[in-house]
Every structure is written in structure tokens, then in C-alpha cells.
Design a protein with these regions (language model features):
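Basic, flexible Lys/Arg- and Gly-enriched helix-loop patches that mediate nucleic-acid binding at interfaces
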Residues: 1-217
Length: 217
């Protein structure tokens, strides 16, 4: 949005991502709409490793994603937005903003989430077509989605899948429906928020353009 010239501060177009803004006293607009400050809350993106649960506590004694937070965030009421499976890696948003978390999790928004799956063997084109069109999971058809083969050999395939739903273990179950096992799964984006170069097991605060995007959903 910033690079596209759609953001103004006090009436002046901003095109540099590193622009400093006095969020309390400046008038910020995106596509002509005033954006109210949301930086009073904390907004983080994490590269979640497998072996952690996306809850604030776990009655089975497993490690939670909050255990990965740096000390400076430990006394904040931070919680994950949505979930990644225990054995799935990748992008997870964490925040103190309950309203935003509820908005992002609501099915009506249908925010695209992109995953990269490592699958045993190759997936024939007819099966890829089935996945794109929708398959039956737990008695309910999945919505149409994007499926792209990134690379493949006789042993494994790397396949990018973009879905707009958030059903439990959806990507894994989609491949199970065509008799393929996912051996590794990583989420790489949520809408326009991308994992980027965040190292595994660490967090980074969202940039102003990323929080602006979330505020407009």
C-alpha cells in the first residue's frame, strides 16, 4: 500500500516504508480513508517451529508459542491469532488486540492463507484439479483454492496451497483425500502479511504498512 502511493500522512503521499509517523498527532489515510491508530497494541509475527501449541497454556504440559517470546513481551497479554497445528511450522500472528484477533478469525473475511507442503511422491494432475475444485473433509466440501506445484521428483513434491478457510488440519486432510501424505507443512503468508526472513522460533514486530493492512480488513 505504501509503495503503491495509497498512504498519506497529513495530506502528503508517503512512498518510503521507513517513514516515521507521529501516530498520535498525524492524520493518516489509506485509499482516502482515515486510519485510526492501532499501535497502542502489540502486533507480532512469529516463525513457529513444530513442537509448540498455539494456545496460552496447555493441560498436557506441552510447550506453547508464548514460551518463544522474548522476555520484554512476557508480562504482556499476548495471544496467538488463529492456530497452526502442533507439527506445522510457519507464520503466526500474535497480538494484544482482541478486536483484531476476532476480526481476523471470523470466517466472513475469508483471508487467504498460503502454505507450502512437502508431499510424498508426485500428485497427478487430476488429483491437483480435485484439490483446486474442492474435496470432501469431515462431510463438508472445501472451497475452491489455489494449488501450484513448486518442484517435484520421484520421491517428494513441494506444493503451494492457498486456502480461504481455517478448518482443523485442512491442508493435511485435503491431501489425505487424494491418498497423499504431507510430511512437512509451513504457512508462509496470511493475506498480505508474509513470513519473509523471520528466523524459526523468533518474532518480529509488524511494520507500519503491515498493521495498516490489518486495520483495513
Amino acid at each position: 500500500l505504501v509503495l503503491a502511493g495509497k498512504v498519506t500522512v497529513d495530506g502528503k503521499k508517503v512512498t518510503e516504508l521507513s517513514t516515521d509517523v507521529d501516530i498520535e498527532n498525524s492524520r493518516v489515510t489509506v485509499n482516502g480513508k482515515i486510519v485510526h491508530p492501532i499501535n497502542k497494541h502489540i502486533y507480532l509475527k512469529m516463525n513457529k517451529p513444530k513442537g509448540y501449541v498455539c494456545t496460552t497454556s496447555d493441560d498436557k504440559g506441552r510447550k506453547t508459542v508464548l514460551d518463544l517470546l522474548p522476555e520484554k513481551y512476557r508480562d504482556k497479554r499476548i495471544f496467538p491469532v488463529g492456530r497452526l497445528d502442533y507439527d506445522t511450522e510457519g507464520l503466526l500472528i500474535l497480538t494484544t488486540d482482541g478486536d483484531l484477533a476476532q476480526k481476523l478469525s471470523h470466517p466472513s473475511h475469508e483471508i487467504a492463507k498460503t502454505y507450502v507442503a512437502k508431499v510424498e511422491g508426485t500428485v497427478p494432475e487430476p488429483d491437483l484439479a480435485k484439490l483446486r475444485k474442492g474435496v470432501m473433509i469431515d462431510g463438508v466440501m472445501t472451497k475452491k483454492c489455489k494449488v501450484k506445484v513448486l518442484e517435484k521428483d520421484e520421491h517428494f513434491s513441494r506444493i503451494e496451497v492457498t486456502i480461504s478457510e481455517g478448518r482443523n488440519r485442512q491442508v493435511r486432510k485435503m491431501f489425505e483425500s487424494v491418498e497423499k501424505e504431507v510430511v512437512f507443512l509451513k504457512r508462509v503468508s496470511i493475506g498480505e502479511i508474509r513470513l519473509g526472513g523471520v528466523p524459526r522460533g523468533t518474532v518480529r514486530e509488524l511494520r507500519p504498512d503491515e498493521t495498516e493492512y490489518l486495520s483495513l480488513i
